């Protein structure tokens, strides 16, 4: 159990830390739904089962069988001659528009989620990490099939994301 140092004069910071702990617990609860490779178009990410989530406290749903395309050129991954390359994409939605937001390409294991600025006013629903094998052809976001031999893909669902209390207090 977390205890707070009563001698600290920074009571506000202690409260923010406590609220962040609660938020972490709630934020990591499962969101109903799953994602994977598209079936109508294997170049897209598909919502396999409906995703239920909160957007500004309001319940929203992304219907099963919704397929979301990558952005041509912007979401490409350039292959490297000797090192596998990763790129992390987040599936985000505001309940009206659902899209993929790309992080920065990096060596395998070093790619990071896109910045808060890129995520914008959306709820993060899932994470996709694509890896392009070294010495392979590039990943062309508009035409490459996600089950192509030179691509390894991982799909994860996310908990409910919310601003950190320590960021706003």
Segments predicted by a language model, with ranges:
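Beta-strand-rich solenoidal segments
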Residues: 3-169
């Amino acid at each position: 159990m977390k205890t707070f140092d009563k001698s600290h004069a920074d009571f506000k910071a202690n409260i923010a830390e406590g609220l962040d702990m609660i938020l972490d617990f709630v934020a990591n609860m499962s969101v109903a739904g799953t994602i994977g490779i598209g079936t109508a178009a294997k170049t897209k990410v598909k919502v396999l089962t409906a995703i239920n989530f909160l957007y500004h406290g309001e319940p929203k749903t992304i219907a099963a069988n919704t397929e979301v395309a990558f952005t041509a050129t912007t979401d490409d991954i350039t292959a490297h001659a000797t090192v596998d390359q990763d790129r992390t994409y987040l599936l985000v939605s505001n309940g009206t528009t659902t899209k993929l937001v790309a992080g920065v390409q990096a060596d395998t294991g070093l790619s990071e989620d896109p910045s808060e600025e890129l995520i914008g006013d959306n709820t993060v629903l899932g994470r996709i990490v694509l890896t392009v094998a070294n010495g392979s052809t590039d990943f062309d976001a508009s035409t490459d099939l996600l089950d192509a031999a030179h691509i390894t893909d991982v799909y994860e669902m996310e908990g409910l994301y919310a601003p950190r209390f320590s960021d706003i207090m």
